[in-house]
């Protein structure tokens, strides 16, 4: 349902500035209405009669009549009209149509009154403070302690104290005090007075609104609409405003569309902090407490407790006969302290606890009627007059008021308004700042920032909400009914309280309780006699024994000497637990009971000294734990164990308990665990038979008969063994209760036991040193450290607080036996030995030599364990955290979902999340051979750890897992089949960082130092390995790993992809003999990088279609291995770029310098080499076929072809060689070529041919002799004439280097066309060349042509020179000549 306001002005607030503006308009008539928008109730200090105020936080609107703001709630279309004249007035007229807002009367229902009511109610809450006196009634609970005093005959009155127990119920009444606040809530009922708002009928005056009919004309002006959520497009007219009351977003309709203008919320709220003024409403919150006052009615139940006179039910106290054991309870004289319970008489005040009825005082909340002042809300009734405003419907005729549209408009914009914009009376809102302007006399005058101030009022509105809670306080009225005691009927249920009725008598008896204590003294006197009769030595000594506890320690000290034997005592740390054994010394108090001497026999239990190993074992079972200390033969714990020796006496004393069967032994027993000695007290029950003589109590003497049973109590000495059965004996006492009401007095004997009428809830102190609570749901046990839980024989535990009641389980500190053996369900364990095996368990810490364990679903474990300690959490969602040393283990075992380990484990320790730990995490440090492990199947697990000489690993099938860590001489491993996993870290000193086989898409990033390894296993597709490997470190991708990538830096290390890897990328830096390598049998892989100082970048053997790209510097090597096909090597080298042997169809491209080389090894087929060599070599090795070599060589470079059918071309300077033709059938083309293979050809400048069947065609050889010894060779040497002789390019003469003959054909051509052929022979004897000219043709010369113009014709004569040979020219004329010497050398 959307709410509509049709007003002349919107979204404007009034503050002091508005007051100033009102001064500017003070001459306007009251008929001029204005509309304001704000947060909270409008202040009466602004506005004029007829003005409209919209509270945007509540959707209420107010109209000012008679200088009072009247509240309305608009559920429909509300129109308010003002006079046509003035500013904003016409649109206000539409507001008159708001008379439909009569529905707003709902709002009138005391909303305002609620606020006032709340304040009044708060005053009532003050009365509730008196209820605090009812707390004194809690002292009445102390009166219950007085019941123990009932052991005195006077204790009968103590039963009245039971009524005091009902007073406890009265404590519930204390809660009722809060109910008194509820009384204030009653004022909220005055909010009902808000209903009086119906008086708004008086609002008939709204007929004035009829004038508003004229305002109907204003309808064409603007409408302010509101609703929940974004406005509907079909809602409203252009120029209308819409307020989203959920978001406080303000919209304006422009051209049929709703446009967001600004948000009225936000910053205003900050100012709203001022709203703290609404604190008065907070008192109304106290009224909320008044609801609790209803519970105070239960306090009335305490009244029913008066009925509790039937408290005769105290018969259940017959169990109190067990209280006869309470005679031993003479110790119960301490109950004399209960005398203080006399103060408990104040517990009568506890009756005041029924002051829950004081919630009745909440009736004072009637003062809340002052909230009737809220009836001012009745003025809101005037708003009802708006109902008459419905007559405004007639105003519909006033549509003519549309002319009034010229009245005022609400404009919006970003920034200051344009002075040419709008008309006088219009409103402009700057949507950037929330500042609102009004146009006056042609000027835009700033009025207020819409944001902010409203927020202040909004705070007040919040307080009003609290007042609504005060309405809840009405329930406090029900508390008044509680006075009627109707609620008290519920108290009837408190029949248990009937005993409490008796307690009423006890109220008087409370004072008597002091007497009761005295009576206890009387009984105590008798008891003294009885004690003596009983072998009171036990009792008397036992008392002294308490003092003797210290002395007992001295005795134990002697045994401590034996502890000296416990040199193993170094384990003495455990011995500290032995100090707890000193608590056993308290047992020694019993030792003062001469029986303690028997405890000395306990000393004979030097075998217990063996317990010294378990020094705690000396303490008796604790020493056994000491045996665990044997595990700590580190013996330090044993030292403490010496103290345990003292405890051993105590332990033997426990055995002494069994000795209780020997009455004397009873003395010793009591001395040891004197508490068990209390069981000996059962023997005292036999004594109680004597007391049966005392049977004055035996007035219930029937009980004395039971005393006969006490005779059996002697047998009961045997019963000492049945100490555990002692509780059962109490059951026997219950039988005594059957004997009669006198048993009620036995209830006073409850000095050792108090039982609730429900027969389920029992409080017992019958066992010395133990307070035992038995409850249907909740049990809290506080153990001094002298007894059970859960015996055999606890072995150095105790010291705890236990809550179980069918394994809701709770315990706090120390424990064992073995730490209470598998407690389980909903468990909590804290401090020292802890353990909580079970679902929902919680375990805390410090288990120095044992296990800290929370074995269960949702478990939590923390702690510190040393000396082979273990921290374990087995279960889903478990957390194990701690510090575990000396071969310790921190472990969350199988199938623990979302588990976490956080710990520090050293000395061979292990931290591991076992198999199936999905989403698990290990954070910590595992040192010295330790193992950190997340088991297999651990999906998305995380390990962040440091391991020294240890192992960090995630098991197989653990997808998406991560390891971040450091391993020194250890291993960081993600096992096989771990897809999408990641390792980041450092391994050093032979450490390993590995991802196992079949781990697809995995990522390894790290640093491997000192022979360490970073590797991804075989068959790991799409994985990546990045890192630094130095000092023989290795970064490696396993065999058959497709599409993987390795990148890194290696110093004397190795970066490599395994063999059989396809499409893998390997790039990096290898120095100091480092290697970047694809291991072989790689397909389509890429290797790139930089290698220096004997580093290598290599493609392994049997690789296909692989690319090797890099720089080999300072003796580095770039190499493609043997038997590879279709590979590409591209690089730069001051070392070697090499294509291994038996490569097919591969390509080498590169640059080599400084004695470097680019090489294609032998037996390669169809190889292409292309390079640049500076003082280096480019060559193909022998045995290669069909190789092509192209290159350029400088500074002594050599470009050589040694393969069959190869082709080489290039350039070398004079100091170098290009392409020595080293293989048969090869061809070299270039400069400074040499053919040294048969049937090959060398062509170029300075070409040479050395082998048979080969040929060199040389142009102007520059140095050396183009001929070489051997079989016949064909060489062409080009020469030119220098003056009259033919010389080589360097001016020297051709020579024959070896002895032998050279048959020469010289073909000479002149520049003018002369051509001649000469034949001659040269012989070289090793020092001198000799030329022989044949006779045919004459002179060996044939002249083919000599142009007529050349005359005389030149002639040519072969001659010998020094050294070598030449041809001289006669009549050269002006021609220049070249000569080609074709030489067949026969050597």
Curated annotation (Swiss-Prot):
Pfam families: Collagen. Glycans are attached at residues 6, 794, 814, 819, 826, 846, 886, 894, 969, 1032, 1077, 1123, 1200, 1224, 1232-1233. Residues 98-219, 268-422, 454-753 are annotated as: Disordered. May be hydroxylated on lysine by the viral-encoded procollagen-lysine,2-oxoglutarate 5-dioxygenase. It comes from the Viruses. The keyword ATP-binding does not apply. It is found in: Virion. One of its GO terms (cellular component) is virion component. Residues 114-181, 189-199, 207-219, 268-340, 364-382, 390-405, 454-535, 544-747 have a biased composition (Basic and acidic residues). Keywords: Collagen, Glycoprotein, Hydroxylation, Repeat, Virion. The keyword Transmembrane helix does not apply. Residues 95-154, 161-220, 266-325, 344-403, 450-508, 512-751 form the Collagen-like domain. May participate in the formation of a layer of cross-linked glycosylated fibrils at the viral surface thus giving it a hairy-like appearance. PANTHER family: COLLAGEN ALPHA-1(XXV) CHAIN, SI:CH211-266K2.1. This is Collagen-like protein 6. It comes from Acanthamoeba polyphaga mimivirus (APMV).
């Amino acid at each position: 349902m959307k709410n509509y306001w049709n007003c002349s002005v919107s979204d404007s607030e009034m503050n002091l500035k508005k007051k100033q503006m009102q001064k500017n308009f003070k001459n306007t008539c009251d008929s001029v209405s204005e509309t304001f928008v704000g947060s909270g109730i409008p202040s009466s200090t602004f506005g004029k009669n007829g003005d409209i105020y919209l509270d945007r936080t509540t959707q209420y609107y107010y109209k000012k009549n008679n200088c009072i703001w009247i509240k309305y709630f608009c559920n429909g279309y509300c129109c308010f009209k003002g006079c046509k004249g003035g500013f904003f007035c016409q649109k206000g007229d539409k507001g008159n149509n708001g008379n439909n807002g009569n529905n707003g009367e709902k709002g009138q229902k005391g909303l305002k009154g609620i606020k006032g009511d709340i304040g009044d109610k708060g005053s009532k809450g003050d009365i509730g403070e008196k209820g605090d006196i009812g707390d004194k009634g809690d002292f009445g609970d102390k009166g219950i302690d007085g019941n123990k005093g009932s052991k005195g005959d006077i204790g009968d009155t103590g039963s009245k104290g039971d009524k005091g127990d009902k007073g406890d119920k009265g404590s519930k009444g204390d809660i009722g005090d809060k109910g008194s606040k509820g009384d204030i809530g009653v004022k909220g009922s005055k909010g009902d007075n808000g209903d009086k708002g119906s008086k708004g009928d008086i609002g008939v005056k709204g007929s004035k609104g009829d004038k508003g009919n004229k305002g109907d004309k204003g309808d064409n002006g603007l409408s302010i609409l509101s609703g929940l959520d974004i406005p509907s497009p079909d809602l409203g007219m252009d120029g209308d405003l819409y307020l989203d009351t959920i978001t406080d977003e303000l919209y304006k309709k422009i051209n049929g569309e709703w446009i967001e203008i600004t948000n009225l919320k936000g910053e205003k709220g900050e100012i709203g902090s001022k709203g703290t003024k609404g604190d008065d409403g907070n008192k109304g919150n106290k009224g909320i407490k008044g609801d609790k006052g209803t519970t105070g009615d239960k306090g009335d139940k305490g009244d029913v407790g008066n009925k509790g006179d039937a408290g005769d039910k105290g018969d259940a106290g017959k169990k109190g006969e067990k209280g006869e054991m309470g005679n031993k309870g003479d110790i119960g004289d301490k109950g004399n302290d209960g005398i203080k319970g006399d103060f408990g008489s104040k517990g009568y005040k506890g009756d005041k606890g029924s002051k829950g009825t004081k919630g009745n005082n909440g009736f004072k909340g009637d003062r809340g009627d002052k909230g009737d002042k809220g009836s001012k809300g009745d003025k809101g009734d005037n708003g009802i007059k708006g109902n008459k405003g419905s007559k405004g419907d007639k105003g519909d005729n006033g549509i003519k008021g549309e002319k009034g549209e010229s009245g005022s408009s609400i404009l919006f914009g970003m920034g200051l308004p344009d002075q040419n914009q709008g008309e006088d009376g219009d409103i402009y809102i700057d949507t950037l700042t929330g500042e609102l302007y009004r146009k006056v006399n042609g000027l835009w005058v700033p009025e207020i920032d819409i944001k902010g101030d409203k927020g202040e009022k909004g705070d007040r509105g919040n307080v009003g909400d609290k007042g609504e809670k005060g309405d809840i306080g009405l329930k406090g009225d029900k508390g008044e009914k509680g006075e009627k005691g109707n609620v008290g009927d519920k108290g009837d249920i408190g029949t248990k309280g009937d005993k409490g009725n008796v307690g009423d008598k006890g109220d008087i008896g409370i004072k008597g309780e002091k007497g009761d204590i005295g009576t206890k003294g009387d009984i105590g006197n008798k008891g003294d006699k009885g004690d003596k009769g009983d072998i009171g030595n036990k009792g008397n000594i036992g008392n002294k024994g308490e003092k003797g506890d210290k002395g007992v320690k001295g005795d134990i000290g002697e045994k401590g000497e034996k502890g000296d034997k416990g040199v193993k005592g170094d384990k003495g740390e455990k011995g500290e637990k032995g100090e707890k054994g000193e608590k056993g010394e308290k047992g020694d108090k019993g030792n003062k009971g001469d029986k303690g001497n028997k405890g000395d026999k306990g000393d004979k239990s030097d075998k217990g000294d063996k317990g010294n190993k378990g020094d705690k074992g000396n303490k008796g079972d604790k020493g056994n734990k000491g045996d665990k200390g044997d595990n700590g033969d580190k013996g330090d714990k044993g030292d403490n164990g010496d103290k345990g020796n003292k405890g051993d006496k105590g332990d033997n004393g426990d055995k002494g308990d069994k000795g209780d069967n020997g009455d004397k032994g009873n003395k010793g027993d009591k001395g040891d665990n004197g508490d068990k000695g209390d069981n000996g007290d059962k023997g005292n029950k036999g004594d109680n038979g004597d007391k049966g003589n005392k049977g004055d109590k035996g007035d219930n003497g029937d009980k004395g008969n039971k005393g006969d049973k006490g005779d059996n109590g002697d047998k009961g000495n045997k019963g000492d063994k049945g100490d555990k059965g002692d509780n059962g004996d109490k059951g026997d006492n219950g039988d005594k209760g059957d004997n009669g009401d006198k048993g009620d007095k036995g209830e006073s004997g409850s000095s050792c036991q108090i039982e609730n009428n429900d027969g389920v809830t029992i409080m017992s102190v019958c066992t010395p040193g133990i307070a035992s609570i038995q409850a249907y749901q909740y049990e809290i046990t506080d153990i001094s450290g002298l007894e059970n839980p859960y015996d055999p024989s606890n072995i150095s535990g105790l010291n705890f607080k236990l809550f179980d009641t069918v394994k809701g389980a709770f315990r706090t500190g120390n424990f064992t036996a073995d730490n209470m053996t598998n407690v389980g369900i909903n468990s909590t364990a804290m401090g020292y030995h802890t353990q909580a095996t079970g679902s929902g368990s919680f375990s805390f810490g410090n288990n120095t030599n044992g296990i800290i364990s929370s074995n269960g679903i949702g478990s939590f474990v923390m702690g510190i364990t040393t000396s082979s300690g273990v921290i374990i959490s087995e279960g889903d969602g478990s957390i194990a955290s701690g510090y575990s040393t000396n071969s310790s283990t921190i472990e969350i075992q199988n199938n623990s979902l979302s588990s976490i380990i956080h710990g520090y484990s050293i000395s061979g320790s292990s931290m591991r999340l076992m198999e199936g730990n999905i989403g698990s995490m290990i954070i910590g440090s595992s040192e010295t051979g330790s193992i950190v492990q997340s088991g297999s199947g651990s999906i998305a697990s995380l390990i962040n750890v440091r391991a020294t000489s240890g192992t960090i690993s995630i098991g197989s099938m653990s997808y998406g897992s991560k390891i971040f860590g450091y391993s020194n001489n250890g291993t960081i491993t993600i096992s096989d089949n771990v897809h999408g996993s990641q390792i980041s870290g450092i391994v050093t000193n032979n450490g390993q960082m590995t991802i196992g086989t079949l781990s697809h898409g995995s990522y390894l990033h790290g640093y491997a130092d000192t022979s360490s390894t970073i590797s991804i296993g075989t068959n790991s597709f799409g994985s990546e390995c990045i890192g630094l490997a130095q000092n023989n470190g290795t970064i490696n991708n396993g065999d058959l790993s497709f599409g993987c990538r390795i990148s890194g830096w290696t110093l004397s290390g190795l970066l490599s992809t395994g063999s059989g890897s396809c499409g893998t990328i390997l790039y990096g830096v290898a120095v100091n003999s480092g290697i970047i390598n694809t291991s072989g049998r790689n397909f389509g892989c890429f290797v790139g990088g930089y290698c220096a100082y004997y580093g290598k970048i290599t493609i392994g053997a049997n690789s296909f279609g692989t690319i090797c790209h890099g720089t080999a510097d300072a003796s580095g090597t770039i190499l493609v291995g043997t038997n590879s096909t279709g590979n590409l090597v591209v690089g730069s080298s001051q070392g070697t770029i090499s294509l291994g042997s038996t490569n097919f169809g591969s390509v080498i491209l590169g640059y080599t310098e400084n004695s470097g080389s680019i090489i294609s090894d032998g037996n390669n087929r169809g190889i292409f080499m292309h390079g640049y060599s500076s003082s280096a070599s480019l060559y193909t090795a022998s045995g290669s076929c069909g190789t092509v070599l192209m290159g350029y060589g400088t500074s002594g470079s050599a470009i050589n072809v040694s393969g069959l059918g190869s082709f080489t071309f290039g350039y070398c300077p004079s100091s170098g060689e290009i392409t020595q033709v080293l293989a048969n059938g090869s061809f070299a083309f270039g400069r400074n070529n040499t053919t040294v293979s048969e049937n090959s050809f060398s062509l170029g400048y300075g070409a040479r041919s050395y082998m048979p069947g080969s040929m060199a065609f040389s142009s102007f050889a520059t140095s050396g002799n183009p001929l070489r010894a051997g079989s016949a060779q064909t060489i062409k040497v080009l020469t030119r004439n220098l003056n009259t002789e033919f010389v080589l390019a360097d001016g020297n003469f051709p020579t024959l280097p070896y002895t032998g003959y050279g048959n020469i054909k010289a073909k000479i051509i002149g520049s003018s066309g002369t051509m001649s052929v000469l034949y001659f022979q040269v012989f070289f004897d090793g020092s001198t060349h000799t030329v022989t000219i044949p006779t045919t043709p004459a002179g060996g010369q044939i002249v083919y042509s000599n142009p007529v113009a050349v005359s005389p014709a030149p002639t040519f004569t072969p001659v010998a020179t020094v050294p070598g040979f030449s041809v001289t020219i006669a009549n050269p004329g002006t021609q220049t000549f070249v000569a080609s010497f074709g030489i067949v050398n026969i050597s």
